Amino acid sequence: MEPTPDHGEQSYRGSGRLSGKKAVITGGDSGIGRAVAIAYAREGADVLISYLNEDEDAQETARWVEEAGQQAVLFPGDLADAATCRAVIDKAVEVFGRVDILVSNAAFQMTHETIEEIPDEEWDRTLAINLSAFFHLTKAALPHMGPGSSIIGSSSVNSDNPVPTLLPYSATKAGIANMTASMAQLLAERGIRANSVAPGPIWTPLIPATMPEEQVESFGQQVPMQRAGQPAELAPVYVLLASDEASYVSGARIAVTGGQPIL
């Protein structure tokens, strides 16, 4: 992938903000997930990296986590299957003993010019991976999360400003924003926080893999900053939301959009 995304490999500096915490990150093999895994490890967290089947990419992320002196656990599997979601959490509990941070970040998208072009199977898969997996992961993790734990959903600017050619994807990202808002209210009495992050155009492998070439070439130019963001520019937000510094932040959605407002 050219240019190579910046995941903070050479730039992110930790300060112990997540020392001793145990994190689960889905879609952690590349893109935003890799950047978050690197940042979490450099802040002192052990990380379970859930991914589909990109073993080489996942091993590269694990190498960065271990280089930071933290434990990396790799778990391949298709999150469209609820049983896989439960197995991810089971593995985290087996190795770590608990879950302090859950980042539901894995996503699937395809572009289509008309509604009729969208295969039923693709609609179902998009909802299963992007939205239903978030539910199944959270439900499985909650018995192993204590006060001070944090749940973070990767939403999108498309939740408020949907791109019509990304209809299924946009619908799921709006769902994630609403799910975290509801979770924040349901889980407050347990001391568990839930928030979402709404990225704008971020340069990840998902972009050239799912978009027409002409859209890839102009990707990010539509926002006020006139460029795509890098995964490394998102990671500090995920660190904040996972840390005790955000102890009164729950039910929020933080936009990282290059100047495109979400109101």
What are these regions (language model features)?
Residues M1, D6-Q10, H112, N161, ...:
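Short C-terminal tail/terminal secondary-structure segment
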Residues D55, F75-I89, D120, A232-E233:
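The beta1-alpha1 cofactor-binding region of Rossmann-like NAD(H)/NADP(H)-dependent oxidoreductases
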Residues E113-I115, P119-L127, F219:
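Substrate-binding pocket helix/loop in short-chain dehydrogenase/reductase
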Residues I118, P162-S170, S182:
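Active-site loop-to-helix junction immediately N-terminal to the catalytic Tyr of the SDR YXXXK motif
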Residues T138, T172, T180:
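Active-site helix of classical SDR
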Residues S156:
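Residue(s) in the substrate-gating loop at a strand-loop-helix junction
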Residues A188, R193, V249-G251:
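Short, small/polar-rich loop/turn modules that mediate ligand/substrate recognition or access, typified
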